[in-house]
A protein has these predicted regions:
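Nucleotide/phosphate-binding catalytic cleft detector across ATP-hydrolyzing
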Residues: 1-48, 69-81, 102-199
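Gly/Thr-rich phosphate-binding beta-strand-loop-beta motif of the actin/hexokinase/Hsp70
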Residues: 39-69, 87
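Metal-dependent phosphodiester-processing active-site neighborhood
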Residues: 64-95
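Short, structured loop/turn "capping" segments at alpha-beta junctions
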Residues: 97-101
Length: 199
């Protein structure tokens, strides 16, 4: 009810233009849900894990027959900032170098040829360690990444592209590294809801 503002108009300014709207209906969805629905290959899976890797946390849920299972929602404090901080600390300890998060991320994306080779080695080792720790934490939270597909999205999804594969037997990853995918998914959901409303 509070999101609809009791039917009262809401005024705001966006990009220099004034707007007055009335909110008639609100739909709420868990983080990452809309992005997962953009993947046609997942729609026939009975159960799918969705892991949204953000800066501070990794938000988890399981979709059962495309529907979010609220009982499986978890938030792990294993976001990319923790990963980058740990990598930075290991480089400082091992090599005496103080690398920035931007430098480390550049190596993780595979486009940092100018970085010290020993530092790269530590970055890759720590990224591998982080990936295994993350997959283990997901399993400990009751979601078996070996038994069902795991969709990874958010800022940290790119990291898993290089460090988790179905071949290693740790999980069945589907990496969604398009930062606009949630918006695209919400657009599809809105279109479907509008079509149902018109019928």
């Amino acid at each position: 009810v509070y999101l609809c503002r009791d039917g009262k108009p809401v005024s705001f300014r966006f990009e220099g233009q004034d707007y007055v709207i009335t909110i008639s209906k609100v739909s709420l969805y868990p983080q990452g849900y809309a992005a997962a629905l953009t993947q046609g290959s997942l729609l026939d899976e009975p159960s799918v894990i969705v892991a949204d890797i953000g800066g501070w946390t990794v938000d988890l849920m399981r979709l059962d027959n495309r529907i979010p299972n609220a009982a499986t929602c978890r938030s792990l404090e294993l976001g990319m900032i923790r990963c980058l901080d740990e990598i930075s600390e290991q480089i400082r300890r091992g090599l005496g170098l103080s690398m920035t998060a931007a430098q480390i991320e550049s190596v993780l994306r595979g486009d940092a040829s100018h970085v010290n080779e020993d530092a790269k080695k530590i970055i890759y080792q720590e990224a591998e360690r982080y990936t295994k720790r993350l997959l283990s934490a997901i399993a400990e939270s009751g979601l078996d990444v070996r038994a069902m597909p795991a969709v990874f999205l958010g800022g940290g999804a790119t990291l898993l592209k290089h460090h988790a594969s179905a071949a290693d037997g740790l999980c069945r990853p589907i990496i969604l590294d398009d930062v606009c995918l949630n918006a695209k998914g919400y657009e599809r959901l809105t279109e479907r809801m509008s079509q149902k409303h018109e019928q």
